[in-house]
Curated annotation (Swiss-Prot):
<keyword id="KW-0406">Ion transport</keyword>
<dbReference type="GO" id="GO:0042777">
    <property type="term" value="P:proton motive force-driven plasma membrane ATP synthesis"/>
</dbReference>
<comment type="similarity">
    <text>Belongs to the ATPase alpha/beta chains family.</text>
</comment>
<keyword id="KW-0066">ATP synthesis</keyword>
<dbReference type="Pfam" id="PF00006">
    <property type="entry name" value="ATP-synt_ab"/>
</dbReference>
<dbReference type="GO" id="GO:0005524">
    <property type="term" value="F:ATP binding"/>
</dbReference>
<dbReference type="GO" id="GO:0046933">
    <property type="term" value="F:proton-transporting ATP synthase activity, rotational mechanism"/>
</dbReference>
<dbReference type="Pfam" id="PF22919">
    <property type="entry name" value="ATP-synt_VA_C"/>
</dbReference>
<dbReference type="InterPro" id="IPR020003">
    <property type="entry name" value="ATPase_a/bsu_AS"/>
</dbReference>
<dbReference type="Pfam" id="PF02874">
    <property type="entry name" value="ATP-synt_ab_N"/>
</dbReference>
<protein>
    <recommendedName>
        <fullName>V-type ATP synthase beta chain</fullName>
    </recommendedName>
</protein>
<dbReference type="InterPro" id="IPR000194">
    <property type="entry name" value="ATPase_F1/V1/A1_a/bsu_nucl-bd"/>
</dbReference>
<keyword id="KW-0813">Transport</keyword>
<dbReference type="InterPro" id="IPR004100">
    <property type="entry name" value="ATPase_F1/V1/A1_a/bsu_N"/>
</dbReference>
<dbReference type="InterPro" id="IPR055190">
    <property type="entry name" value="ATP-synt_VA_C"/>
</dbReference>
<comment type="function">
    <text>Produces ATP from ADP in the presence of a proton gradient across the membrane. The V-type beta chain is a regulatory subunit.</text>
</comment>
<dbReference type="InterPro" id="IPR022879">
    <property type="entry name" value="V-ATPase_su_B/beta"/>
</dbReference>
Length: 461
């Protein structure tokens, strides 16, 4: 029989202090019954002798200290998981949000998950085709990788997230592909955009959506990504699926952490965020990967908005340390109408060389990727020089590089949010753009590939 406590001592923001408790453990699930019979949930955040600090998921509004009854349920916050979750929409705490029935769970899992033994990890080396040339061709996503998108306020990261979720697939694999989508602190319009896009395109049949709205309690945001990852782990490691987890917006998650930290009166770290922000983010990002002997995998694309477009802000800064690269959206490209506005030069996928090449994408992928990077960088330099000195100061070769940079942005990077390019189409487009430059400038591509692919590209112009 569970004990019922009427010893609530204090409620501050999203936190409740309960006195005279016995046999309570960290992270234990708590049920709070209000004086009017309403029930809310929370979890134990800290224990000090006979006092327990409880974090409230549904907020503290309307709680009367004298009339509240508290029960400690003896288990952590869990999610009931089943393959029937595919095609469904849930709120940030795993309750159905689409008007459908509750899921009949195959099992219940602690949302904190179990760390993957480093020795049991399998190395990511299989190409995932997103259909977006700037990612597939230049910053390749590999199965089991964690590759964040660094965006800015007002940039179209929601459209890019929906496009990747809709188009992504593992080539040359018979295993099922699923998408787990977590919207953290999004507006109603943005959440509805995702639901409508998934439903309209049929992508929802292979997707699980967790939606935490901006007007939902901030504390729910701390649970939402863990709910999504718990569902992903079940589908990947129990059902053998390749699971792509897209989480937007991690910045809102970190703001919720800061709110709890401030309520606990902890010593703040950089910009007021808690000193354990790095450790906390790692408990989310490190749940990506592959396990030896298991067919499935979890690939993560966390999306975050950089406050004031600042890459040195603690959230993108710490995310960059934990993850394996970053895709950066550019406000300059966005103003030019380049969609998606992916800035390929500062973007990076640290595992891209493991997922490309013969029998994965195509033999010429690495060489063309290096050449496109180099040519675009030189083209941007030439354009900057022409602004300062005038176009007449450029050599004929520099003018060609400037022309290449414009064509690269308009044709290669810009493809809209509905075009789904195969890796063959992306590579062939790269070769077509390289024909703008003299053959003598293509020094990063082997002669055998120049003979095989360059002539074809010139003929197709």
């Amino acid at each position: 029989m569970l004990k019922e406590y009427r010893t609530v001592k204090e409620v501050v923001g999203p936190l409740m202090l309960v006195d005279q408790v016995e046999s309570v453990s960290f992270d234990e699930l708590v049920e709070i019954e209000l004086h009017n019979g309403e029930k809310r949930r929370g979890r134990v955040l800290e224990i000090n002798k006979d006092k327990a600090l409880v974090q409230l998921f549904e907020g503290s509004a309307g709680i009367n200290i004298k009339g509240a009854k508290v029960k400690f349920l003896g288990k952590p916050l869990e999610l009931g998981v089943s393959e029937d979750m595919l095609g469904r929409v849930f709120d940030g705490l795993g309750n159905p949000k689409d008007g459908g029935p509750k899921i009949i769970a195959d099992e219940k899992r602690d949302i904190s998950g179990i760390p993957i033994n480093p020795v049991a990890r399998n190395y990511p080396d299989e190409f995932i085709q997103t259909g977006v040339s700037a990612i597939d061709g230049l910053n390749t996503l590999v199965r089991g990788q964690k590759l964040p998108v660094f965006s800015g306020s007002g940039l179209p990261h929601a459209e890019l997230a929906a496009q990747i979720a809709r188009q992504a697939k593992v080539l040359k694999s018979d295993s099922k592909f699923a998408v787990v989508f977590a919207a953290i602190g999004t507006t109603f319009e943005e959440a509805q955009y995702f639901i409508d896009d998934f439903t309209k395109t049929g992508a929802i049949d292979r997707a699980v959506l967790f939606i935490n709205l901006a007007n939902d309690p901030a504390i729910e945001r701390i649970a939402t990504p863990r709910m999504a990852l718990t569902a992903a782990e079940y589908l990947a490691f129990e059902k053998g699926m390749h699971v792509l987890v897209i989480m937007t917006d991690i910045t809102n998650y970190c703001e919720a952490l800061r709110e709890v930290s401030a309520a606990r009166k902890e010593v703040p770290g950089r910009r007021g965020y808690p000193g354990y922000l790095y450790t906390d983010l790692s408990t989310i990002y490190e749940r990506a990967g592959r396990i030896l002997g298991k067919e499935g995998s979890i690939t993560q694309i966390p999306i975050l908005t950089m406050p004031e477009d600042d890459k040195t802000h603690p959230i993108p800064d710490l995310t960059g340390y934990i993850t394996e690269g970053q895709i950066i959206l550019s406000r300059e490209l966005y103003k030019k109408g380049i969609m998606p506005p992916i800035d390929v030069l500062p973007s990076l996928s640290r595992l891209k060389d493991k997922g490309i090449g013969k029998e994965k994408t195509r033999e010429d992928h690495a060489d063309t990727m290096n050449q496109l990077f180099a040519a675009y960088a030189q083209g941007k330099q030439a354009k900057e020089l022409s602004v300062i000195l005038g176009e007449s100061a450029l050599s004929d070769t520099d003018k060609l590089y400037a022309k290449f940079a414009d064509a690269f942005e308009e044709e290669y990077v810009s493809q809209g949010f509905t075009t789904n390019r195969t890796i063959e189409e992306t590579l062939n487009l790269g070769w077509k753009l390289l024909t703008i430059l003299p053959k003598s400038e293509l020094k990063r591509i082997r002669d055998e590939y120049l003979e095989k692919y360059l002539n074809k590209a010139e003929e197709s112009k």
